[in-house]
Structures are given as C-alpha cells and as structure tokens.
Amino acid sequence: TSRRQRQMCIRDRDLEERNRARKKAMRLLEHMDRTEKGLYDRLLRAGFSEALAADAVAYVKDYGYVNDARYATNYIMYRIHDKSRQKIFQELQQKGIDRQTIQSAWDEAAELERPDERKLLRQMVEKKYAPGSSLDEKEMRRLYGYLARRGFRSGDIFSVLEEMDIS
C-alpha cells in the first residue's frame, strides 16, 4: 500500500499543479486580453512546464476566455486609424496569430471603420513637416525610413509627399 499511496500523492501533486496553472491563466486574463501564444509564453515565464501551460491555455480557450480572432479584431479596431495595414498585420503575427485569422479580422474591421491609409500617411508627415517644406537628402531619407518602418508602401509615400509638395 505504501507504493500505491506514493502514486496517489504524485497524482494529487500533478492535479494541484494543473489547477494552479489554470488559475494563473485565468488571473492573467483578468487584467488584459491575450493571444493563445501570449498566454502560453507568460505561463512558461511563470515557471510552468510546457505541458501544464498548454493544458491551461486549452482550458481557458474551451470556455472562450481566450480567442485569437476576437483579440485580432479588437486590436485592429483600436489601431486602424493609427497604423498601416502592413504594420498591424506584422504586430499581430508577432503575437502568434495566423495570417488567415488576421485577414478575416481585418476584413470585418475594415467594413465598419473604412481605413484611409493615405490620410493617415498625410497626418504622419504633417506631424513632422509642413506642406511645401524643402528637405535635404538626409531629412528625406529619414522621413521615408520613418514612414516605411510604419508599414506604408513606397508608392504611397512618394505620391503623398508629392501631393504635399515636400521635396
């Protein structure tokens, strides 16, 4: 019976650890919405094994507490007027959301919000330079790099700069 008692103790400890991981996952989601990957990574950093972290993510996912499609839609709705489509896609992919889920969320958000990337691009340029400004080559390179890093296409950048008579 002592062998059987040891096995019971091990099983009890495993169940306690599993429950601890699940509770931690739910506590993490109380503070902010997270992606599956974000929650999984956070549980690993908290010291849980890969198996326990995966179990906890599956547990909260089954109850609908974590939902990558919902996260992507909310993320896009919040940032659609501040960032380019490409930049938003890149950030969501870094958070572990697959491209198809992001595209579906983008289509849903774009129907409601109608993003105008050229207007956003114009606003970003106006923050730095007035229309009609004359820039030297170094300033122009910096401005172009700044806008390109934010995910704007080069054709759009050049045409907006031309429209604003910035050269």
Each model region followed by its residue ranges:
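Single conserved hydrophobic/aromatic residue that forms the stacking wall/gate
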Residues: 1-10
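Short alpha-helical segments that sit at the start of domains
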Residues: 11-19
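Short capping segments at the starts of secondary-structure elements
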Residues: 27-38
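Short helix-coil junctions and helix-kink-helix linkers
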Residues: 42-48
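Helix-turn-helix DNA-binding segment
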Residues: 60
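Glycine-centered, phosphate/nucleic-acid-interacting loop/turn motifs that mediate DNA/RNA or nucleotide
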Residues: 64
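Strongly charged, low-complexity linkers/loops
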Residues: 68-70, 89-149, 162, 167
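Short, cationic-aromatic polyanion-contact patches
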Residues: 72-87
